[in-house]
Amino acid sequence: MSQVILDLQLACEDNSGLPEESQFQKWLDAVIPQFQEESEVTIRVVDEAESHELNLTYRGKDKPTNVLSFPFEAPPGIELPLLGDLIICRQVVEQEAKEQQKPLDAHWAHMVIHGSLHLLGYDHIEDEEAEEMESLETEIMLALGYEDPYIAEKE
């Protein structure tokens, strides 16, 4: 049986109202076991200041962002189940859900799924890659009972 070990770090000034650890686990379990047997993922939920700093340092973007993915790269010849880290900014996720008129839990689910696919090597820089990644995201979201996260863009 596939197993995803979650290390959840809540690093917000106010952690109330965040999804439960079991929800984060459910979202990871919907993605990662399709691709590998055993994995360990850290999800760190942060405030805008930490997201902004990391986004500037690692992507050269001077603003906070919804999710950052940091895949773990083991040294050659060493196999470890560590998949990587997801850094999710609470305020950006909440603001985007409001602006896009999406249920908040659906947007949290989408950010975990989106970030997990990045950890697994998927990207959306090229159109063809974006289509494949968005298709997988939609398939997983629908399987979890959520709407297509890209429905507004398709209309």
Swiss-Prot record:
One of the GO BP terms on file: rRNA processing
Per the entry, the cofactor note is: Binds 1 zinc ion.
Into which EC class is this enzyme placed? hydrolase
Residues recorded as binding Zn(2+), renumbered to this chain, are 114, 118, 124
Q: Which Gene Ontology terms of cellular component type are present?
A: cytoplasm
Q: Where in the cell is it found?
A: Cytoplasm
A Pfam match is: YbeY
Q: What is its EC number?
A: 3.1.-.-
Q: What keywords are annotated for this sequence in UniProt?
A: Cytoplasm, Endonuclease, Hydrolase, Metal-binding, Nuclease, Ribosome biogenesis, rRNA processing, Zinc
User: Which GO terms fall under molecular function for this chain's record?
Assistant: metalloendopeptidase activity; RNA endonuclease activity; zinc ion binding
HAMAP family linked to this entry: Endoribonucl_YbeY (MF_00009)
Instruction: Please give the function described in this protein's UniProt entry.
Output: Single strand-specific metallo-endoribonuclease involved in late-stage 70S ribosome quality control and in maturation of the 3' terminus of the 16S rRNA.
Give the family from UniProt: Belongs to the endoribonuclease YbeY family.
PANTHER family membership: ENDORIBONUCLEASE YBEY, CHLOROPLASTIC
What name does UniProt use for this protein? Endoribonuclease YbeY
Q: Write down the species.
A: Enterobacter sp. (strain 638)
